[in-house]
Amino acid sequence: MAVACSPEKDQSLLQLQKVDSSRVILSPVLSSPMETNQPICIPSPYTDRGHDFPTIPFYSATNFSYANPPAISDRPSVHQTLSPSLFWPSHGHVGTTLPLHHLQARPQHGQAVQSPWVELSPLDNVLTSSKSARRRSQENEEGEVSSGGKADLHFCAVCHDYASGYHYGVWSCEGCKAFFKRSIQRHNDYICPATNQCTIDKNRRKSCQACRLHKCYNVGMTKCGMRKERGNFRDPQMRRVTRLSSQGRTSGPSVLNGPAVGPLNTPQPPALTSKQLIERIMEAEPPEIYLMKDMRRPLTEANIMMSLTNLADKELVHMITWAKKIPGFLELGLLDQVHLLECCWLEVLMIGLMWRSVDHPGKLIFSPDLSLSREEGSCVQGFLEIFDMLIAATSRVRELKLQREEYVCLKAMILLNSNMCLSSSEGSEELQSRSKLLRLLDAVTDALVWAIAKTGLTFRQQYTRLAHLLMLLSHIRHVSNKGMDHLHGMKMKNMVPLYDLLLEMLDAHIMHSSRLPRRSPQQETVEQCDAPARPHSPGTSGPTNTWTPSCTGGRGEPQ
């Protein structure tokens, strides 16, 4: 017997028709009596709107050997299969599983079965409905995520554009990801044309490469910051992690119980080893500076001072670039960066002068095309004492056989230790910047110890050499103070025009120092005692306060 189904919109009965008969009988599915020895065929070609259900096979009692199989040789429409198809009408589909099961697990009991179809038990209904509800809730959740659009989108931590993924440890867009990749692969030396405070956003991210790279490091981008969680974003666990991460960024820091998940941790730049730090500092070394003009003979005081100030101004430009390349220097506060350079610029120039002159006894190599002997330097008034101090310090460097790794570490320590006692503010930003400065200074000190240990000396010899190298810094500071006094005196006498950058650095060094000028008793008044005097710069109106700060007494001496 075959069943032909004619699905109508409002009909809940199936039409049962014999193969060899033209009568159509309407009978309910559950209440109609059926023959137990014949298969049921419901080959209705039904397809629901928007739902495509697979064919569900059902088997009659004939397949389980507890009834005699009927003779079906005269029924060509059934063919050789006993596995008919069942399709449900469209108005009866409510998104749940079929409410009818076949007695497939009970043939061994030998019970007399009147019909191959039975209703589900209440427990089966509960289990089926719970599975269906769970499936619907999961589909609804995925639908909300897909239809929510930008609800779960992330923004680039650098330029605040839409992020394309988790790159180098942070959420970033394709542009910032590619820019950071190029920067770390090619070692580009970017220089900010302004004050390293350029605004980096979606529209102005290409205006300053130096500030853009600085912001990449500030937000946590690192070469080793690979994404640990690379699962599908549609996974429920991944959605919960990213949703919690976005809430943490908007609502501030919170204490989480249990282990932290990868994307929730703010990735920190990996700490450099002592060897890597020295390599980075050596790569930051400025190139050789040439005077690019012939010295007139015989040498005069004005001629020598003009050449020396010209070289100093050129070296100051490269010194700023060198300081920016030192790992961790740009992480300091901007005021600290400026103060460090203003307080140590002459010391940095002098240790570089000693390093260039170490192989030329009795001479000072200011540049490859400018070298002065003691006799030539004596023509500058007050310069001979400074010249002798520089020659003596250079001889000490030669005796210690200073290595290049040790030299770059000492030079970096001069920069980082220059204004250690001048900062008096106690704000949170100042304290944080100071702690970064101390950590950076400790890292450079460890690198110096590593460079000394690499020479193969014993522990006692290493400690002794470290002490001797550190004592060089005090000699350089002493010579620098002498040189600052001499340069300031030349400026007051208008002996030589000073360039803008050199003049600014000279005035800033005097201003940041704690040494105050001592006025003569005839000029002292109550108002003058309350207000400290400031050195007069050329080109400004007002009385000229001519004084030369002493390097040892802590007070200025009148001229």
Curated annotation (Swiss-Prot):
Principal place of residence: nucleus
Region span, Disordered: 128-148, 243-269, 514-559
Cellular compartments per GO CC: nucleus
Keywords, sorted A to Z: DNA-binding, Lipid-binding, Metal-binding, Nucleus, Receptor, Steroid-binding, Transcription, Transcription regulation, Zinc, Zinc-finger
Zinc fingers classed as NR C4-type: ranges: 156-176, 192-216
One Pfam match: ERbeta_N
UniProt subcellular location: Nucleus
NR LBD domain: residues covered: 273-509
GO BP terms in the entry: cellular response to estradiol stimulus; estrogen receptor signaling pathway
GO function term, MF aspect, one: hormone binding
Ranges for region Modulating: 1-155
Residue ranges flagged as DNA-binding region: 156-221
Quaternary structure (record): Binds DNA as a homodimer. Can form a heterodimer with ER-alpha.
Function: Binds estrogens with an affinity similar to that of ER-alpha, and activates expression of reporter genes containing estrogen response elements (ERE) in an estrogen-dependent manner.
UniProt free text on domains: Composed of three domains: a modulating N-terminal domain, a DNA-binding domain and a C-terminal ligand-binding domain.
Family from the record: Belongs to the nuclear hormone receptor family. NR3 subfamily.
Protein's UniProt name: Estrogen receptor beta
Gene that this sequence comes from: esr2
